[in-house]
Amino acid sequence: MERTCLAVILAAGDSTRMKSSKSKVLHPVAGRPMIAHVVEAVASAGISSVALVVGRDAEDVAKAASIAGVDIESFLQKERLGTGHAVLAAREAIAKGYDDILVTYGDVPLQTDGPLKAARQGLADGSDVVVIGFHTDRPTGYGRLLVKDGELIAIREEKDATDAERTVTWCNSGLMAINGRKALDLLSRIGNANAKGEFYLTDLVEIARSLGGRVTAVDAPEIEMTGCNTRAELAVIERFWQERRRHQMMLSGVTMIAPETVFLAYDTVIGQDALIEPNVVFGPGAVIDSGAVIHAFSHIEGAHVSQGATVGPFARLRPGADLGTGSKVGNFCEVKNGRLGEGAKVNHLTYIGDAVIGAGSNIGAGTITCNYDGVNKSETVIGENAFIGSNSSLVAPVTIGDGAYIASGSVITVNVPADALALGRARQEIKTGRATLLRERALAIKAAKKAKA
């Protein structure tokens, strides 16, 4: 029978060092609140029940933590009396009788399911407490994991460690798994007879051993256990997250010419044989199909780019943009809630908003779909194989039929039938010699002003 597990995620900190008006767990990593990354890691470890211990911004934190397939119950920690006290804020959930209790933190967004699964396996193998540790070249300030004969005998804090113990490089991450049948008894035995008068979760090691229990430790990569307390640490976490995801994508067949300049969102999807040039930014909701090309300095969010389509350079795709197979959005173009059919081209200096463009149509430079009247948005529909001349304004709602031509510089306010030519501009007039008169007049005015000065 599969073991049941409750993850207790501690997210009630005051976030003082973050210097922010909101809880640190709400700050984004790859466009997603860091607390959501933690819940995703927990879910990947096969855990579908979460007790979320909250404090500041409780409702916002609970909302940000919500992801599909995970049952989350929030518990308010009214006082900050240490990690042991925080876990017991979820006493009601722990008491439901899970086989495993996994304790993790809402400000450790790089954690993955591997160490969490290893900790749970330690419980399945007979341990009462399993601590997740990490090896580091910079152990100063961390509690050291002291192991003897395969068992964890103590977590020694820096200030209490001997010189020999300070040479230990295996450190406590703070994450641990506890035998669910014994968890409440063990947690209730944690005291606060220390300088700060707080209840420390690390005391479980000594408590479990004193009761004859087995305590072990498992290892995790140091970077995955990085906590986020300051903006500087947030930047480090963002950098590593990006490096890890870029590497995964390149191994899956995506070409990135200068990967260190490409920034991905948590849900970015890029297909095999897609090419991403330097300095491209993906916001949430971007899907790039195989064989697409994203040229340099483009920004894509909430958009779909089909197979063989081309974007940029210097293009912006906003939510709702959907580029058909082999279509093109070129330099200095913006598309918002616009669909381009197969082979359609929007080559340069164009805004497409709330529009449908048929297959094979060509949109000339400087064209604008005028979609907003100050109150409401309206749609522009352009049929297949239409040609829109440069510097045209299409005032929505308006429909351009299949194969229609729009003369350059036109302002189109009325529907254009299929295969028709529409002109909406003033007739050109030529006044011979008038430029000379205008120039002489301007020079005379300039000379008069100079004489008065």
From Swiss-Prot:
Q: Which residues bind acetyl-CoA?
A: 365, 371-372, 390, 408, 425
Top-level taxon in the UniProt lineage: Bacteria
Cite the CDD domains for this sequence.
Answer: GT2_GlmU_N_bac, LbH_GlmU_C
An MF annotation (GO) of this entry: glucosamine-1-phosphate N-acetyltransferase activity
Q: Name one GO cellular component term.
A: cytoplasm
Q: What class of enzyme is it?
A: transferase
Swiss-Prot/TrEMBL cofactor(s): Mg(2+)
The entry's Mg(2+)-binding residues are 107, 229
Family indicated by similarity: In the N-terminal section; belongs to the N-acetylglucosamine-1-phosphate uridyltransferase family. In the C-terminal section; belongs to the transferase hexapeptide repeat family.
Annotated function: Catalyzes the last two sequential reactions in the de novo biosynthetic pathway for UDP-N-acetylglucosamine (UDP-GlcNAc). The C-terminal domain catalyzes the transfer of acetyl group from acetyl coenzyme A to glucosamine-1-phosphate (GlcN-1-P) to produce N-acetylglucosamine-1-phosphate (GlcNAc-1-P), which is converted into UDP-GlcNAc by the transfer of uridine 5-monophosphate (from uridine 5-triphosphate), a reaction catalyzed by the N-terminal domain.
Q: What is this protein called?
A: Bifunctional protein GlmU
> Organism, per UniProt?
Rhizobium johnstonii (strain DSM 114642 / LMG 32736 / 3841) (Rhizobium leguminosarum bv. viciae)
